[in-house]
């Protein structure tokens, strides 16, 4: 039996236990509630609502867990972007944006997780997304730039946990267009001019 199968069985068992607990609570409390009057009835109702809320939250937790495991599996097996797009039913239609689909965030998670796994540079991400083939004034208008922005955001957060002399190796490098894009992203993330110069390289002209 595979790991995913065992996880689903355990999650289903937990869900059934929660339902059974809620049902048992109702059965035990009914006589006492009738004897104690309106005040007790309100207390019972509030407690039931808490139990029901916990039960209703469990399926979404299971769903989130399964999705995360699936993404991890895709990353480990190095599946193609086309495979993941197909699995997530993400289809680029004329006049629409993939970013409007809730599953686009899962695709971003797959891409960023893969880059982190291989310790990819931002330049590799930039080129992998095809941003190097576009005029600079068009880059920010496509869905792929949103994914690139997320990767820079993750690395910026990682930089906050490192010594300043390690920043350069994390975010430096790239064409003038990519460096300008990174500088603009880092600015929106609250990095000042000095910090951006340290991250990108002292020779880089960064926008104020």
UniProtKB/Swiss-Prot annotation:
Location of the region described as T-region in the Swiss-Prot/TrEMBL record? 170-208
Sequence segments annotated as region (Y-motif)? 137-157
Which keywords has UniProt assigned to this entry?
Host cytoplasm, Host nucleus, Repeat, Secreted, Signal, Virulence
Q: Where is this region: W2-motif?
A: 111-136
Key word Signal present in the record?
yes
Q: Where is this region: W1-motif?
A: 70-92
The segments labelled Linker region ln2 in the record are 158-170
> What upregulates this protein?
Expression is induced during host plant infection.
Q: Where is the signal peptide?
A: 1-22
Q: Where in the cell is it found?
A: Secreted; Host cytoplasm; Host nucleus; Host peroxisome
Tell whether Signal is among the UniProt keywords: yes
Cellular component terms per the entry's GO annotation: extracellular region; host cell nucleus; host cell peroxisome
Where is the segment annotated Linker region ln1? 93-110
Which residue ranges does the UniProt annotation give for the motif RxLR-dEER?
41-54
Which GO biological process categories is it annotated with?
symbiont-mediated perturbation of host vesicle-mediated transport
Quote the entry's note on domains: The RxLR-dEER motif acts to carry the protein into the host cell cytoplasm through binding to cell surface phosphatidylinositol-3-phosphate. The C-terminal domain of Avr1 comprises three motifs (W1, W2, and Y), two linker regions (ln1 and ln2), and at the very end the T-region. The T-region of AVR1 is important but not sufficient to trigger R1-mediated HR and W1, W2 and Y are equally important for recognition by R1.
Q: What does this protein do?
A: Secreted effector that acts as an elicitor of hypersensitive response (HR) specifically on plants carrying defense protein R1, through its interaction with this protein. Also acts as a virulence factor that promotes colonization and suppresses cell death induced by CRN2 as well as callose deposition, a hallmark of basal defense. Interacts with host exocyst component Sec5 and thereby disturbs vesicle trafficking, a cellular process that is important for basal defense.
- Family designation: Belongs to the RxLR effector family.
Describe its partners and assembly state: Interacts with host exocyst component Sec5.
> What protein am I looking at?
RxLR effector protein Avr1
Biological source species: Phytophthora infestans (strain T30-4)
